[in-house]
Amino acid sequence: MGAGNVIFLNGSSSAGKTTIATMLQQLLPDPYQHIALDQFRDGMPGRFRGLNSPEGAPGARGLNVVPTQREGQLVTRIAFGDHGEQVLRGMRRAIAAFAREGNHVIIDDLLFRPEYLHDYALALEDLDVWL
């Protein structure tokens, strides 16, 4: 059995990625596993999912939602600490391993930085990926 196909959905929060993934699962003849960043975020211990956590706190080491000002507007920014970055790297490689075992995958992610796309390219380099 060969590697599975990978469909990559990238977009901002609430852009409809999960809805599109669900529709694709219904329409495609083969089974596609929907794997989302949210699943890995939710799998982190609660103390590593911060809300404006200070430097050095567990929430700042994982995924930290930080309020900030941009052009006079209050917005939120997602900051990943060392544990959060480790989880993201592991997630990308887990997705690649899943596909290499012959499973078709729909990735539902948000590429916060260009380095994340580069890391996906390394992890998925030998697989067929549709963006």
What role is predicted for each listed range?
Residues 9:
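Hydrophobic anchor at the beta1->P-loop junction of P-loop NTPases
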Residues 99-104, 110-131:
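ATP-dependent NMP and nucleoside kinases share a basic, alpha-helical "lid"
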